[in-house]
């Protein structure tokens, strides 16, 4: 419990967000408006965080995709599985397309899922991300809220 309290403190959150700049994430914590979750089974981890989406965000950590990543494309899923097995992104010609999409738009579900995983570590604790559009242009600012399922409600 102490660890979660420390994680949610503004000072630590600002520090954690600063670490994301190396991975081309720029995130700005906004004032907490104490918006109540629409169900008592959820609690906020982060409320109303503003994130600038960058199309060249490169992930250097192993990704574990859980249910909240259901909208990630098959190509990105294969890429994540290859990284989890310890193989490089370019092994067997399965290159990571830096444009992400032919029309150069960014898959927000992938980028924000990675952002949340890197910030909070355990994907199974994060069950909902509100405020995500399906796609965004490079450099577009979006605001997200991250929810966690309460411990007594988990299956």
UniProtKB/Swiss-Prot annotation:
Q: Which superkingdom?
A: Bacteria
The name under which this protein is listed is Protein PtsT
Species per Swiss-Prot/TrEMBL record: Geobacillus stearothermophilus (Bacillus stearothermophilus)
């Amino acid at each position: 419990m102490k660890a979660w309290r420390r994680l949610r403190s503004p000072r630590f959150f600002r520090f954690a967000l600063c670490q994301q700049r190396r991975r081309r994430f720029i995130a700005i914590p906004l004032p907490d408006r104490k918006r109540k979750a629409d169900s008592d089974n959820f609690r906020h981890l982060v409320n109303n965080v503003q994130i600038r989406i960058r199309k060249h965000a490169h992930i250097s950590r192993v990704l574990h995709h859980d249910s909240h990543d259901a909208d990630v494309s098959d190509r990105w899923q294969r890429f994540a599985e290859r990284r989890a097995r310890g193989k490089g992104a370019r092994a067997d010609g399965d290159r990571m397309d830096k444009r992400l999409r032919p029309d150069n738009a960014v898959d927000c579900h992938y980028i924000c899922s990675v952002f949340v995983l890197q910030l909070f570590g355990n994907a199974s604790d994060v069950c909902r991300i509100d405020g995500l559009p399906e796609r965004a242009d490079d450099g577009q600012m979006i605001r997200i809220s991250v929810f966690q399922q309460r411990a007594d409600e988990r299956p």
